[in-house]
Amino acid sequence: MGRSVSARKRHDQSEVRRMRGRMARSAARTCARRYLAAVTSGDRESSLPLLRSLVKRLDTAARKGVFARKAVARQKSRMCRLYNGVFSSPEVVRV
């Protein structure tokens, strides 16, 4: 940690930012885990709201700079493809 007041302030700010990013990352991973569990169990009714929740969390994390924008787009695409593959229905889900 720095000696000057500004260095201490920057350190404190980076700690707060790191914790916020950690919480957002953890929330997104938890959502993904719940969604994957619902899809693998074949529960169609609960997996669609979980997918929407996951997409919302990922977009928020990307907007805040926790995840890279294209990495989030790739993850969302894979999750939607998984849903459409498992529950192959005439309606295609795009989020």
Curated annotation (Swiss-Prot):
Pfam family, one: Ribosomal_S20p
Molecular function, one GO term: structural constituent of ribosome
Keyword annotations of the record: Ribonucleoprotein, Ribosomal protein, RNA-binding, rRNA-binding
Organism: Treponema pallidum subsp. pallidum (strain SS14)
HAMAP family: Ribosomal_bS20
Segments of this protein annotated with the region Disordered: 1-25
Coiled coil: none
Lineage: Bacteria, Pseudomonadati, Spirochaetota, Spirochaetia, Spirochaetales
Protein name: Small ribosomal subunit protein bS20
GO terms for cellular component: ribonucleoprotein complex; ribosome
